[in-house]
Amino acid sequence: MKILVFGAGVLGCNLARNFFRAGKDVTLLARGNWAAEIQKNGLRIKDKFLPRISVSRIPVVTELKPEDRYDVIFVVLRYTQLGTILETLRENQTKNIVFVGNNVRAEALAADLPEKNVLFAFASS
């Protein structure tokens, strides 16, 4: 299964790392300096309880193109950012979209993507 985690904040990075550690084919969509940092040095996450930093060499992309194909896209963005990516999701051929977060507009988000299988989830770290 080919997975894209769309969003490289705290929750998105943790989700991508967990998929990666489980042996899944995961790619992380990140932008700007953060994308360059992950590409160069790997995804580095400081352990909450132990004095260590894990490094995961997760593939990184900086955009989602219409022709990119994934089995599922996990969208892990702030609520205020969701409106800016709906057209990108509509144009992409991936059918399965999971919005991870508070999902205060769940019905509206699903209605905005009528050709997609839209699901909602809440992440725990």
Residues of each region from the PLM?
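Rossmann-like NAD(P)(H) cofactor-binding subdomain of soluble oxidoreductases
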Residues: 53-125
